[in-house]
């Protein structure tokens, strides 16, 4: 399979160049300054403190590997359903080309509930960090496979200066070593290889021994059943980012409750 991640990053750079023309930095700064902030990390910790799993529930219409996941896709309704059934936070895909996402979907989902929202996209430039704040995100994703360490550190610092939390995502030990140089407590382990899209939840289980106790491990991708959840919880993982299993269900929030509560 061709390297999907490299294709996505190339497209992102084209999108940034175009966006700078249509929405200059100064304009974005004004929009960003008008946004309120919700405590993403705090919402996860509150769930843990109450003895519950902390679920980052994803609003995702499609993916490159699975195609369209949900034909009847109304972000506001999905967000409300998640909030009513115990989600800690939302994750909303804003990538248009590969995931059929949209900044508009993030705005709609956030307006429909009180949950903090992660902008799920492939961030490679500070412009996208500011853009995330301007569209109303409370957190961003930084993917170690897509960024060198100095840039990742700079993007995190900029995000924190804007009041954004950072979820740093890794898939292997070498990426984890670099990710642990960041200040964020949130370390996501993606069970899906972004270069091949192969998925196994053993990826998370095999890396837990290398993560300090002061970090919050977020297991991402491939959590499809109650059995998967129980396996993770038995290993000490209590924070989950789940999309596909919910999106394929008739009622996403009810599926969340069935799997986790």
Swiss-Prot record:
EC number from the UniProt entry: 4.1.1.48
GO-annotated molecular function: indole-3-glycerol-phosphate synthase activity; phosphoribosylanthranilate isomerase activity
CDD domains given in the database record: IGPS
Gene3D superfamilies the record matches: Aldolase class I
Top EC category: lyase
Gene Ontology annotations of biological process type: L-tryptophan biosynthetic process
Pathway(s) the chain acts in: Amino-acid biosynthesis; L-tryptophan biosynthesis; L-tryptophan from chorismate: step 4/5
PANTHER family given in the database record: INDOLE-3-GLYCEROL-PHOSPHATE SYNTHASE, TRYPTOPHAN BIOSYNTHESIS PROTEIN
UniProt record similarity statement: Belongs to the TrpC family.
Database matches in NCBIfam families: PRK00278.1-6, PRK00278.2-4
Protein name listed in UniProt: Indole-3-glycerol phosphate synthase
Provenance organism: Burkholderia pseudomallei (strain 668)
Lineage, broadest ranks: Bacteria, Pseudomonadati, Pseudomonadota, Betaproteobacteria, Burkholderiales
The gene coding this protein: trpC
